[in-house]
Every structure is written in C-alpha cells, then in structure tokens.
Amino acid sequence: MPIPIEIKKLFSAARILGSGDDRVTLSENELFCLLAQCCSDLSIQAAVSQLPSLSVLPPSADYYRLPLAWFQTAQADCPSASALVESLAACVAHEPDFSLYFSNLAALHKRRRKYQRILSTQPRPTMNQIGPRSLLEFGGVQHELLAAWLVWRKWIFDVDNRAAQETGYLFEPVLASCLGGEAVGSRNSPVKRLNEQGQPTDEGRQIDCYDGEEQLAYEFKLRVTIAASGQGRFGEELSFPVECRAAGLTPVLVVLDPTPSPRLTELIAKFTANGGRHYVGADAWAHMDSKAGRTMAVFLERYIRPPLTEMAIHEDTGPEPIQLSWSRDEILIRGSNESIRIPRRV
C-alpha cells in the first residue's frame, strides 16, 4: 500500500530544523530512537510499529533522563529512512494522533540538540565588548575578579537570550498543538487592538493558542504574581480578554501555578467579565488533558508538566551555590552534588 504523502512530509519535517550553519539534521539512528520512544510512551507494540528492537537499550524510560549522546549511539538494526517512514505510517494508522506526538517530540529533541551546540560554540566575550562596563565597578575589587565577573555575566546573558529564543519557537506552539489549536502571531491574528474609543485597529495581538473550532483564544501563564510584571505590562494582560470579546472570541486564561495573588484575582475577574473562562493549577492541567485527548494528554504529562512543575518548586528558594570554571576544552558548572560539563568547540 503506498505511503500517504502527508506521512512523508511529516517525516521530512521532523528530520530537519533550520538552515545553513544553524541547521540540525536528525540521523536515521536518532529518528529510530525517537519513534521507539513514542511507541514506548503509548504502549504501541512492535507488531504494530514494525520497528526492530533497540540493540542499545535506553538507560531510562524517561526521555529527559536520556543523554543526547544515546540517541546517536549506533543501533545494530537501525532501519533505513524508507523503512522508518513505513513504521511511522503504521503507527499513525493505529493511532491518528501519533503523527502530532512524534512531530512534537522531534521538535523538542531538535531544539535540545541545537541548544547544546549553542552552549558549545557561543563565543567568549571580549574585553573590546565588555571592558567599558568596568567603569561602574572598577577599583572595588581585584582586577582579575572584576574581569571574570564581566566575562561570566555576559556569556550567561548571551546563552540565556538564545535559550529564550529557542523556547519561544517551541513551548507555546507545542502546547497549542496539544490542545488542537495553534499559536498565532500578531500579524495574522483575528484579535485586534482597540483604540481609546474602543474601536478595533489594524494592529493584531498574539494568541498563545487559537482554537478555530470553538473560537477560543487561550492565554497561557506559568504564574501570576505582583512582581511578575510592571503595571504597563499588566495593563496589556487586562486588555486581552476585552479585545478577544470584541473580536467574537471567548478568552481562556490558563495559569499552571496555583499560587494566589491580587493580580491573579484581578485578571480572572477581567476574563469572567468578558465572557471568558479560567483554569488555575490542577484545574489547568485537567482542562488541558481533557482538551488534548488520550494520546496528546500523555505528551503533556510526560514532556511539558514535569519540567515546569519541578522548576516551580524552586521559585521561592535561594539558588544553590555553584562554581564556574572555563578551560580550553570545556565549561564546568559544579553544584553541591552534581556537575554540568559543556564541551567547547570554539
């Protein structure tokens, strides 16, 4: 039976990210491991997937516990690209949402691959770039310490900016797809900003997730606190449900952290006053699981919820002391119990 064109397009899209020097291309070996991971997550047997057994077993069933190097470890019976496409088609025929599950996991994996390369290649700041900043602190400490402080904070700032960029391409689009919608940029948004007279303008508003079937406009938030944003930014958040209602859409607020705050209460009231809905904490996760359906709820619970929930635990605790060192071959970050080694390829 011929493989549907949509399956071939799905496989091709899953394989490549970006272009030029920034391109990430997944090998057959990596795609084999990712397909096997999806099948394991969804309890799809080999009789269905037609995938051979992995000759090098994963050290954990949890994707986040698997080193990126494992995906590149040669598997003795790795199928060809055409055989992998056939397996993908078989899995999609068995479970239609497998296509989205695999696509999202591949997107996550490619971004993680790309970010590791960024960490390895992000240039060390030069004194030509950062030297003038020493005027603000010069003389207060030894020159060597000040120079190190300038270098580290600039490099960390740079790699954090790159992390924000990569996450922006990943988090909201993946979350939106799990809910059966899509993230919409301001240029193509059906929600328009209102002027002072309450009339729509030509300027659109970004929507975290647009559900065209039910005409819902989602706003995702990890947490809403008094310190989360300035008054100007909060005014933007309060105007979102008003502008959604004016566009004929139902605004939906999803806040993953249940920590109460006056601003959260005010934001919920604004959504409610404009015919909107809100889901906070456990209700937010339950709503998303219900909306996602059986298969994509597994993706949410395995790949989205664990890192967000775990990191939220450390919101109000002081950061653990760490030691940073930079050698020719690596950057070493030491904590109290573990270390992070970043090979350098500059």
Regions picked out by a protein language model, each given a short descriptive name:
Residues 1-178, 327-346:
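Interdomain/boundary linker segments immediately adjacent to catalytic/signaling cores
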Residues 165, 169, 208, 223-230:
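Short, surface-exposed loop/turn motifs that are enriched in glycine and acidic residues
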Residues 166, 170, 174, 204, ...:
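Short, well-structured alpha-helical interface segments that form or flank functional binding sites
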Residues 176-202, 208:
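A short acidic/basic microdomain associated with nuclease active sites
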Residues 200-201, 219, 231:
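Flexible internal linker/loop segments at domain or repeat junctions
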Residues 205-218:
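Active-site beta-strand-loop-beta-strand hairpin of nuclease catalytic cores
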Residues 222-273:
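Catalytic cores of nucleic-acid endonucleases
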Residues 256-346:
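Domain-level recognition of nuclease-like catalytic cores that cleave nucleotide substrates
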